Amino acid sequence: MFTMKKPLLLLFFLGTISLSLCEEERNADEDDGEKEVKRGIFALIKTAAKFVGKNLLKQAGKAGLEHLACKANNQC
């Protein structure tokens, strides 16, 4: 009876270690996926901010030039 317990205990121990390693790999893969998504969202926000910033600067520049032209001609 005791001789049967040793191999079973060894199999259980090896199976537990194997399962633990698989779970660690799976968790590492899931973490990498989250980082990629975060980078993707950040890039999208960054691009949108650049686009909005450029358009606001163009509009502000046009308004500023119109105001300067108005002041120069004293038509304000």
UniProtKB/Swiss-Prot annotation:
N-terminal signal peptide: 1-22
GO cellular component entries: extracellular region
Broad class of the protein's primary localization: secreted
Sorted UniProt keywords: Amphibian defense peptide, Antimicrobial, Cleavage on pair of basic residues, Disulfide bond, Secreted, Signal
GO BP of this protein: defense response
Keyword Glycoprotein: no
Free-text tissue specificity from the UniProt record: Expressed by the skin glands.
Statement: the UniProt record of this protein carries the keyword NADP: no
InterPro entries linked: Frog_antimicrobial_propeptide
Covalent S-S links between cysteines: C70-C76
Record's function text: Antimicrobial peptide.
Protein's recorded name: Esculentin-2MT1
Source organism of this protein record: Amolops mantzorum
